[in-house]
Structure formats: C-alpha cells, structure tokens
Amino acid sequence: MTETLTVLYEDDDVAAVSKPPGVVAHPVGSKSAGVTMADLIAKRWPAVAGVGPAERHGLVHRLDKDTSGVVLVAKTARAFEALTAQFAERQVEKRYTALVEGVPAVPRGRIDAPVGRHYAKGERMTVHPDGRHAETKYEIVETVGDAGRGGAAYALLDVWPSTGRTHQIRVHLAALGHPVAGDTAYGATERPVGLGRQFLHAAEIKFVHPVTGKQIRVKDPLPADLAAFLKELR
C-alpha cells in the first residue's frame, strides 16, 4: 500500500481528505480494485472500520476513480448518519474545477437534465427522459489554449452539482457540447499530451458539523498533474 492520505481537516467526529486520482472509493462486487480509499482510511484511522457500511470504513460519499479532490470521512456512527442525511437532503455544497473542450456560449449557466444508465453501455450514464433528476450549475473562470482564429481551445469552469448522480458533471458537460478535457468516455475528442486523466477535481466542500452545528468549509488545491497541464496552456 504505497498511497497515503492527505488530511485536509480533522476533529474527533469528522475528517476531510484529498482523494488522489486512480483510486476507487471502495470495492464493488467481486471486482478487484487494488488499494481503495476505504483501505487508506482504515489504515489511517483503524477505529472507523465499523462506521457505516462494512466496505466503506466511514467514507460518506464517493468520487469517480480518475477524479481527485476532497471527500468526507465520518469517524463515528453518529457523524456518519448526520452527514449522509445532509447529502440526501442536498445540504452539502460541493464545488468542482473542470477544464472543458471549447468555450460554452453562456458564461454562467444551469444544466437541468435527467441522468440515467446508458441503454447500450451499462457502465456509462447518459441524459435521457427516464433518468433521475439532475442539476448542475457552472461558471467560466477563464479561457485557455489556442484553437486558432483567435479562439480558446478550453474553458476552466467552477461547477456546482446540486444533485449527486453517477458521473453527473461529466454527463452534463458533455450534453452541453463541452466534455471534460481528457474524458474520452464522455465525448472528449482525445486525451491531450500531458493530461493523463479527465480534468475534474473536487475543489471545495461546505457542510454543517454533525456535532457542533457549525458550518465547515474545506478546500483542496488543484493537484500537481492538473496544475502543470493548465500552466502549459496559459
């Protein structure tokens, strides 16, 4: 187990950690996932092994394998119950940083489109009328890269999903016509040289502390691989 956890916030009840890219949240079914976030959490805090479902070790929510960023860990059963309720009631605010192909015509917008399982490709999600309600807000932070004729090749976005459907941000941005850079599963034309994964990072989370009732805000800076790629484009 070579990966280690970067702890962004910690007290007796809850912790916020930085999920590295390439690591899945926890084992799913009988598939071997290698080292998971649940493994790393159990190694760092052995006492949380009994918090929440057995395979999650206190992990309150998940990020896609190749998405990096902040995730919450409940260190007690009381905290796990309270935090999962906040997610279910959409009281947790999450902000992502995404680099997308091209530049959206509307600099600040909202995508309201149902998301469900792809009929032909079961491991992927898609927008379709039989899906579950999903809503994502975005705002252009800057445009970078050269697409020729004075146009920008990419747009850097702040993204706020108000619902938490599987692959929601990736699906919604692809449906907008601006897939996440490097996300070939959802429409990116190709993975650019220097970008080893999809450019999507969970940059910030705000939640109410399950015991004190105070609002907690935790930020996770852009990791080195994405920061280096962005620097090359600027």
Q: Where do the PLM segments sit?
A:
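RNA pseudouridine synthases
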Residues: 1-234
